[in-house]
Amino acid sequence: MYKYLMEINSIEDFKKLNSNEIKVLAEEIRHFLIESVSKTGGHLASNLGVVELTLALHQAFNSPEDKIIWDVGHQAYVHKILTGRRDQFSTLRQYKGLSGFPKRYESEHDQFDTGHSSTSISAAMGLATARDLNKDKYKVIAVIGDGAMTGGMAFEALNHIGQSQKDIIVILNDNEMSISPNVGGLSNYLNKIRTAPIYSKVKDDVEYLISNIPAIGKSVMKTAEKAKDSIKYFFVPGVLFEELGFTYIGPVDGHNYHSLYDVMNRTKNIKGPVLLHVMTTKGKGYTLAEKHPDKYHGVNSFHIETGEPISCNENLSYSEIAGKTLVECAAEDEKIVAITAAMPSGTGLNNFAKKHPERFFDVGIAEQHAATFAAGLAANGFKPFFAVYSTFFQRAYDQVIHDACIQDLPVTYLIDRAGLVGNDGETHHGSLDISFLSCIPNLTFMAPKDGIELSEMVRFAAKHNGPVAIRYPRGHSNMDSQENFSPLALGKGEITYHSGNDVLILALGTFNKMGLEICKDLEENNIFSTLMNPRFIKPMDEELIVEMVQKHKIIYTIEDNSKIGGFGTLVQVLLNDNQILKPVKVCALPDRFIEHGNVEDLYEELGLTKKQIVDQIKKEFSDL
């Protein structure tokens, strides 16, 4: 099945292939990726789109001496295959297996850990500056997608590099046509000339000679520069990058290996910063992914023939529940608007966009802008809901404080993927949001125990006159009858189970379900307990917590946030302020970054399973 792929165990093996063999290898890699990712899950469409780009990159440059940085990093699978990790792909994104992102601990070819968007150009500037300070000569290349270019950080870095004129190559992987390509023979001719080493040298020599002609030299050069700049605005599609100080090359067909290799090889000889614009097709080689690239961006295991997932949960996801409720609220209140930072599908806002297109805003990968944009809307009478993953919400922290909470504006943050998300690992877990949000004045902060409660919290936020954050996990929840649902009230929790006063368990959010199972297991051992659903992280139900703590012998809190600054810590501070000298056992995430893997495996490692907590309580109770 594979003529060349199985012979590649290092970058040196790959470099032995000729161009015709590499074209065959490209198709073998696509077949391998589809087969492999269909079993493990992962980022499929983006990797299928960069096969030829990655092959040309590794032929034209010499990794690891030359430094290649992958923005976001989810498109680095081909890079991993070429650098000796093909035989680990059966463990991709699995517990203790191969990461789905570049990791410095994995390979010397992974120069910089990535996971979030728009960071690669800044990192490249850092590496290039270190290179120049050390008087080294290697190349630094940042590979960034057109989507990531919507992030302001990318342009901050472009601005800095253009001013410094460092030798850095930025490869823009454009798979959405967000920069319109120029066409025609003149464009191709100009690009060919501008990348030719001899042209660069002759151009520099001619400019030097003309500028040194007595009396008229500098005037001639100024006239020539003005003419060149005027023509450039008509014919050069990358004039924006030229104005930032980059030599712009492109667009180049991202699936023509020969063209890519040729232009990359010649780009190495250009002095100063270069932006190479490459046009690719996301999902290339797998028809279903080409037709629906968003659907196949990140996938669970699936059937190759149909593209359908192997396992499917019939319940609604928390994202869908939040989005569905928001649509209903917006039908009742025309001041409600929804905002996403390039993730309408992931955050459950697709239906809102269809139902209320004039009140839906996708701002691109720009969380900082989204947060202040929301505050501006709120300042003028609207009720914005900004749906965002917990890990990406970190990027908007100052805007939440400075632009929304200080002014006490009615902005709601729907914080999706809170807690451990599993296979994407450290860069994607939402393990810090309670720590960094609970300290902000004016912010009301909630965590629902299930889908019904999430829906009610969205409705509560729609009527609340102040900033609100609601955190909820990746996962699904049924929407059974609300017969046992007690209405929400600001700053009030609820008791969801009571069999006695031996142990008090405060189980935050969706851990309340496991808390109920813990209580029932303890009963079988004649240990009787009370289970509380806090609902509000801030303001927490201080009166109920203090009352319950004083009645019980053992106190446990359970959450999926870091132990430092988490909900359990807030409970400890509350008891200390009330001079209650009872120890609180905080079951939370440790003070370290949690690796990738199945969530159940990670909880087992971290001591957060039902059995482990029951065993802890039983031991503590027996020691009383």
Swiss-Prot record:
Binding site for Mg(2+): D146, N175
UniProt pathway: Metabolic intermediate biosynthesis; 1-deoxy-D-xylulose 5-phosphate biosynthesis; 1-deoxy-D-xylulose 5-phosphate from D-glyceraldehyde 3-phosphate and pyruvate: step 1/1
One matching Pfam family: DXP_synthase_N
SMART domains: Transket_pyr (SM00861)
Metal-binding keyword on record: yes
Enzyme Commission number: 2.2.1.7
SUPFAM superfamilies, alphabetized: Thiamin diphosphate-binding fold (THDP-binding), TK C-terminal domain-like
GO BP terms in the entry: 1-deoxy-D-xylulose 5-phosphate biosynthetic process; isopentenyl diphosphate biosynthetic process, methylerythritol 4-phosphate pathway; terpenoid biosynthetic process; thiamine biosynthetic process
MF (Gene Ontology): 1-deoxy-D-xylulose-5-phosphate synthase activity; magnesium ion binding; thiamine pyrophosphate binding
Cofactor(s) named in the record: Mg(2+); thiamine diphosphate
Cofactor annotation comment: Binds 1 Mg(2+) ion per subunit.
Keyword Magnesium attached: yes
Residues noted as binding thiamine diphosphate in the record, renumbered to the chain: H74, G115, H116, S117, G147, A148, N175, Y286, E367
Keywords: Isoprene biosynthesis, Magnesium, Metal-binding, Thiamine biosynthesis, Thiamine pyrophosphate, Transferase
Organism domain of life: Bacteria
Assembly: Homodimer.
Described function: Catalyzes the acyloin condensation reaction between C atoms 2 and 3 of pyruvate and glyceraldehyde 3-phosphate to yield 1-deoxy-D-xylulose-5-phosphate (DXP).
Protein family (similarity comment): Belongs to the transketolase family. DXPS subfamily.
Family annotation (NCBIfam families): dxs, PRK05444.2-2
The protein, known as: 1-deoxy-D-xylulose-5-phosphate synthase
Organism, as annotated: Alkaliphilus oremlandii (strain OhILAs)
